[in-house]
Amino acid sequence: ALFTQLATGLEFVADRRIGRPLGTFDKPRPDLAEGIASGRALANITLSLKALRDLALRLDPDSAKTQAAFDHAIGLSETLNDPLLDHITDPQAWLKLEILQQAIRATRDTAIAEIGPALGVELGFNSQDGD
């Protein structure tokens, strides 16, 4: 269950916290960013990544590739200077956020490939899988 939560958490950050405001290159949707009123859209992404990294470390302290992938994604999020994600209407800012999204998806793939076998488990069903 915890391994599935790790993968689902990464998917949520990439698809919802980033994907919704990212929209498309031609039509970004910064108004759909989470935590606009509190100014925490980017902070929520960064903190989620740090919490998920801690979970991954507790599941498998020897998961060096996963830890490196998390460190890369967290580093990217910490270099963005757009707390509300409202600068993504600028093409360069949009691309930087898309690069972060890709890094998070790569982190998920790495965690599934490295931590799952170390624990002897496979990715399970989650409530967002649909029918």
Label for each model-derived stretch:
Residues 1-131:
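Mature extracytoplasmic or organellar-lumen-exposed domains after removal of signal/transit peptides
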